Design a protein with these regions (language model features):
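Hydrophobic packing residues within well-ordered alpha-helices of enzyme cores
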Residues: 26, 56, 92, 117-121, ...
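Alpha-helix N-cap/helix-start and coil->helix boundary motif
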Residues: 23, 49, 53, 93, ...
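Short, acidic loop-to-helix structural element flanking the phosphoryl-transfer center
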Residues: 80-108, 114-118
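Active-site neighborhood of HAD-like aspartate-dependent phosphohydrolases
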Residues: 1-43
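Substrate-recognition "cap/lid" segment bordering the active-site pocket of phosphatases
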Residues: 114-146
């Protein structure tokens, strides 16, 4: 086994298949807060991005009516209540295991709050593949690099 370097993985939507769930969370947030628009998956993918605050603007949230911090907290409450139904992406575990066997060091770089990231990785039994789990100190998703 020869170490070949470091691989940085994304977590949400890459190693963990939560795209359909986060898409449904957006539509739930819009409905809950009285907004008429809903997004199909393709439109969701078009507007999603970082910073999350700008994504919320693209989705149509009015921060004068619903402040971003409150929306972010509400989203995380809803997301955390249902995320256990999300599983690793197809072949993620096998790929991580094979790369580990070949000597690659692997880390996760995520815009998720770090404690949530650690819980989600552990709940899926993948923590042993990573040398580091790099997440944010808060839930506001400004950038993966802070």
């Amino acid at each position: 086994m020869q170490a070949n370097g470091m691989i940085f993985w994304d977590w949400n939507g890459t190693l963990m298949d939560d795209v359909d769930f986060t898409h449904s969370c957006l539509n739930w947030m819009l409905e809950t807060h009285g907004y008429p628009q809903r997004y199909d998956l393709a439109a969701y993918r078009e507007i999603f991005g970082f910073p999350i605050e700008e994504y919320y603007i693209r989705a149509g949230f009015n921060f004068a009516k619903h402040p971003y911090a409150e929306l972010a907290e509400r989203f995380m409450e809803h997301y955390n209540a249902g995320v256990d139904a999300c599983f690793p992406s197809a072949h993620a575990a096998e790929t991580l295991a094979e790369l580990s066997r070949r000597g690659w060091r692997q880390s996760v770089l995520s815009a998720s709050r770090r404690d949530y990231l650690i819980e989600q990785v552990a709940a899926r039994g993948l923590q042993g593949y990573f040398t580091e789990l790099l997440g944010l100190a808060d839930i506001y998703g400004v950038s993966k690099v802070q």
